[in-house]
Curated annotation (Swiss-Prot):
Species per Swiss-Prot/TrEMBL record: Danio rerio
SMART domains in the record: ANK
Higher taxonomy: Eukaryota, Metazoa, Chordata, Craniata, Vertebrata
Alphabetized UniProt keyword annotations: ANK repeat, Chaperone, Endoplasmic reticulum, Membrane, Repeat
Start and end residues of each stretch annotated as Disordered: 1-60
Record carries keyword Nucleus: no
Protein name: Ankyrin repeat domain-containing protein 13C
Amino acid sequence: MTGEKIRSVRKERKSGLDLLEPDEEPAATGPAKHRGSKIFSGGNHRISRSSSSPGDPDGAYPVHECVFRGDVRRLSSLIRTQNIAQKDVHGNTPLHLAVMMGHKECAHLLLAHNAPVKVKNAQGWSPLAEAISYGDRQMITALLRKLKQQSRESVEDKRPRLLKALKELGDFYLELHWDFQSWVPLLSRILPSDACKIYKQGINIRLDTTLIDFTDMKCQRGDLSFIFCGDAPPSESFVVLDNEQKVYQRIHHEESEMETEEEVDILMSSDVYSATLSTKSITFSRAQTGWLFREDKTERVGNFLADFYMVNGLVLESRKRREHLSEEDILRNKAIMESFSKGGSLIEQNFEPMRRQSLTPPSPNTISWEEYITAETGKAPHLGRELVCKESKKNFKATVAMSPDFPLGIESLLNVLEVIAPFKHFNKLREFVQMKLPPGFPVKLDIPVFPTITATVTFQEFRYDEFDESIFTIPSDYKGDPSRFPDL
């Protein structure tokens, strides 16, 4: 197993446990509020009433109730007519409950009907996070595979809209710079910077970068080009060129059985994180300049005149769970992280995860359905293994420079960023600019990319231009190497 692969997996606990995500929509608490949820469940699930229970007087959560009670027979009869993506008053979906309570038959039935895996409850935990806590290896593996499948399907569903938007957008050259910082001692000095060049022509995009992969642990550098060809079959759309070694690799989505098993080993031996950038109280105020006579700050960023704003009310909320870890796991993880903060690597640590067995199940649940569903919102009775959780909140101070002169609109930028989302730091940029920003285009902004790391992104140059089509093709003297970039 390569250090890069391990790094990628520990980075996000891989696909399902993003280190930093924007606020989700508030959990709706009744059937009528879940009309939009059907996109997650692979079908148009009709909401119907069933016989109510004392704790659920409206009968609003029949699927949740039969999962809670472990009633597989009733679940199988309800599942075709009910919304299996619905959240209850505590933000849990039926899949959350099945996993937390160890009702494996219910969980597998829900997964067979494409119940959403990435969705989070009110505490910020996905079903995969809850499965790691419970510790059943088979269930963790099933959820991980379904999560990857749903992620691929989501990309494929967006593809026609994305290609249409790219085709309507003019051809251009865009240059932006990344500078990473951290408030962790010693970490800032090893953090990278990067100058990215983006070429867009028709439905093709090329990104030249020196930073292909970056986590809060380590970065991978090189002279690299990422090419997206919109008219190629999905399996051949994405390719990465290593311009130093003159090799290329197509980005694959399927993983081998061994890779999946290794990923499960790392999930079961690592902390589970939930980090959310809360934007509920966000406000923008004009940045000021001058000592005696204060005035609004307006400066040139690259070729564009921009108004500077202070971003107020951004809060980074993070939670870390480790009830599934042994004392040995905790000490080992701490040693690895200390090595990273000093510039070390996984290879130097000789890190090779051991094959993990399922944990002993937690004590059987003694809470009734009525007690669970009538509990005060935000104070749900805990189900599953006893929590060992640390929580923290950090106010994120940021500035953003908005220019009315930038030729590209934010919506167009979002479409371009969606194409290059495999680069995780670009995905964080996309999430950030989806907020309601002041007027103009964000030519310079601060964004959090990991709980301890922020980046200043500067759009230095933009021009409409035409390019030789050859820059979107693989050079004839490059050789294919399917293992050059294990993280992709």
